[in-house]
Amino acid sequence: MPTILVQSYGFRQKMKTIFIPTALALLLAACSGNKVTETLKNEAYGNSEFYINKAEQSRNIEEQQSYRLLAVRKLIEENKVVEAQNTFSEILVAKLNDEQKLEHRLLIAQLAALQGNTEAQGVLRALPQTLLSQSQRLRVYQTQARIAENQNDVIAAVNARALMDSYMTDTQSRQANNDKIWEMLRNANRGMLEKAVAGPGEIGLAGWLALVVAYNQNMSNPAQLPQVIEMWKQQYPNHSAVLLLPIELRNVSSFQQTQLNGVALLLPLSGDAKILGEIIKRGFDDAKGTTTMQVQVFDTDSAPINDLLMQAKQQGAQTIIGPLLKPRVDEMLTSPEISNINVLALNSTPNVRAVAKVCYYGLSPEAEARSAAERFLKDGLQHAVVVAPNGDFGTRSAEAFAQRWRQLTNRDTDIRYYNQAFEVTSLLQGSGIGQGSGLYALGTAEQLSDLKQSLDNSPLANQFPIYTSSRSNSPNNGPDFRLTMEGVKFSEIPLLSDPSSSEYKKAEQIVESDFSMMRLYAMGSDTWSIANKFNEFRQIPGYKVHGLTGVLSAGPNCNIEREMNWLQYRGGSIVDAN
């Protein structure tokens, strides 16, 4: 019987893949030229290749035109700008009928918005609104949303997406739209949101603004959030988000505060990585202080991770902190022992995935690079250029920066890799870097010094701000280095940003001013802080803790992100750049 069921399911799947495109082809084949044109008012279910093929096969001019219009629409949805332009150029505008002309003008606006052209808004305003179908009105608001997103106008983008809801025909699309709205609002400036006011009739926008402001105001007290959301639902009972709450907020409704009972700390306490494990444990112990919480400590070099997890659970551990080394993290992720227990892994690997009750925290260059992209946006930069050394560190950092910059601005990053730092000047000449641009330069202190001197002796000197990472910050950097780096901004963890603090002095004494070890000490301290707010990080989007390694928050897959402090070299000294 099981075999029959499997065969039956496979047969249904096969028939489904055959039936849908076949039925679509039969439907369109049954249409006369006029009928095909009428489908312009409806949703297009084929892909661009399907409609291009239909246009090539048709001998009727009107059919050809309509199929090409449909093809352009799908190419825009597929973000294929060049192909959309090429297909658009094949349309004979003089031979379009009224229905085709309306679709043609809407596509002009959509394509312009995709390319970031400002003319898109004017084209939309000129459209005869009363002649638009429901599907076309949806695309008008989609285009308005894209225009607003191109201009980083969060309020206009949310308003357009709120208006889209009435014209969407399926629950999946409406849920995805609500999730996108919430993502934009969560990432927006809180002060701006509190001052924003919805216009007359903008009920959807008003509801969204009320929801995000109430959420932000109560985020520091997560236990109140379920009640806050229920009160909002009573105020806006007909709002789209009442029926389809953003997925991120669903966990909030069932939130329970972290109750830390029984911790197991898994670290390398023998072998080559012993020194790393010991300093992290010292930071953890100092943060824990006199708390009577029972903490079991396991050496990850003493036994397989699966065995250590079993032993920890048998001894009552409900939260696992560690392991630290990447191979051990991969080993842990394949263990059945991590089910139904909180796990804070102290590293991330390419195999990291979303696992219930698992978060990942570490001092990765990727997290610092993402923080740099956010700094670029905060400083009002429009164009991002990254120069990085060839190799693992450079590639990981550059790609992480580019990914975050794309998420924040919908723009690409110009990435250049170098073998020798003095090559950077020639790499940047002719790149278009200038006003409105920022350079994220990565490397060691020596590489950064060579790179900066090369730029200072070229026509590119003082043409754009330069940023770098903490990798170049070392206690061995003397006055000459600081003078060479004049004007350069760099990210650093809070612990190392304030040498006058008691935490800095304590860590400095423990590790004899070794910045690398001080960072690991700070990591150990923050590990204790994260464990104590584990549910908050996992379930409360945007929840933050101010730690010694940065302002900590949970990103995708519960990767703990770190918002860094920013310092600047000025007059031979290091000053606050915040």
Curated annotation (Swiss-Prot):
Spell out the Gene3D superfamilies in the cross-references.
Answer: 1.25.40.650, 3.40.50.2300, Tetratricopeptide repeat domain
A Gene Ontology molecular function term of the record? enzyme regulator activity
Give GO BP annotations, semicolon-separated. Answer: peptidoglycan biosynthetic process; regulation of cell shape
- Classification via InterPro entries: LpoA (IPR007443), Peripla_BP_I (IPR028082), TPR-like_helical_dom_sf (IPR011990)
Q: Where is the lipid attached (N-palmitoyl cysteine)?
A: C31
Covalent lipid adducts (S-diacylglycerol cysteine), residues:
C31
Q: What topology in the membrane does the UniProt record assign?
A: Lipid-anchor
Where found in the cell?
Cell outer membrane
- Its domain of life reads Bacteria
CDD domains per the record? PBP1_YraM_LppC_lipoprotein-like
Record's GO cellular component terms: periplasmic side of cell outer membrane
Which UniProt keywords are given for this protein, alphabetically ordered?
Cell outer membrane, Cell shape, Lipoprotein, Membrane, Palmitate, Peptidoglycan synthesis, Signal
* Residues of the signal peptide: 1-30
> Self-association or partners: how does it assemble?
Interacts with PBP1a.
Q: Which family does it belong to?
A: Belongs to the LpoA family.
* Listed PANTHER family: PENICILLIN-BINDING PROTEIN ACTIVATOR LPOA (PTHR38038:SF1)
According to its UniProt entry, the function of this protein is described as: Regulator of peptidoglycan synthesis that is essential for the function of penicillin-binding protein 1A (PBP1a).
Q: What is the protein's given name?
A: Penicillin-binding protein activator LpoA
